[in-house]
Amino acid sequence: MIRIVAAFVLLSGLWLPGLQSALSAESCTRPSLEQTADLYLQALKRGAPSLLPLAPGATYIENRKATPFGEGIWGSPLEVDFSRSLLDVDICETFTEIISAKTDHPYVIGTRLKVVDGAIAEVESLVSDRDDWLFDADSYLKYSSTEKWDILPPETRSDRQTLIRVASDYFDIFEDYAAFDRVPWGIPCVRIEGGAYTNPKNEPNPSCTAGVPKGGGVPMTNRRYIVDELLGAVMGQVDFGGPKGLPDAHTFRLEDGKLRYVHVITLCPDGCPVIPPPEDMPRP
């Protein structure tokens, strides 16, 4: 219907405010975003950004720094052991978790793609390695690859605003523990944090409240979200500790309105803070 209206408007020499954004929204579909995310992965595996469908003036940001395509993680082909993508048709962006564990230089990567009119306008990656928070790519691969993140039945999904609110409430806990009770904790629920895992003994009814901070006045600022309602998932990208804090991405999945999975990638560009493990964090 939008295309019919657009054709009429163009033929009549008129242009309606907001029509361009409506057309862009119509052209941004789940299959097109999935294809773009797949093209990104194929290009990364070959170390060939030239294979990306880039928009004119497209930018690449790696670990919060503007980086030329072809440098950084693009410097050589990347062996990808596992990946998972969130597709947000509302804002035409994707987020892909990428695990490269079986190499001499392992990585866990979180990449955001911004798509405009079918082309990639922005690529932003958080590339974590051995010097980053609780990093263990083998552990991350072991646990993430066995989780079930399939499309949820409609009756078990949460809407966009609910998913964002849950992520926001979770982030609020770091500054004020009063937010803890606002989070819909589920059982079972597990968290992968860098590679640390909250259910190493494979208990039948684990909780991902283990190791959650008890409120330490730590702000989580510059919050940006990518939402995939069909997966019940939301990724929140933040500055851990306030402006110029640690680059961080938390990914959440809700099932039946309850938290089921939490994944965390946190970079330590100037070295990780020395923090003793929480007393309630399970040990292997």
Summary of predicted features, one role per range:
Residues 1-4:
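Positively charged n-region of N-terminal signal peptides that target proteins for export
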Residues 6-18:
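Bacterial N-terminal signal peptides
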Residues 23-284:
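C-terminal and inter-domain tail/linker signature
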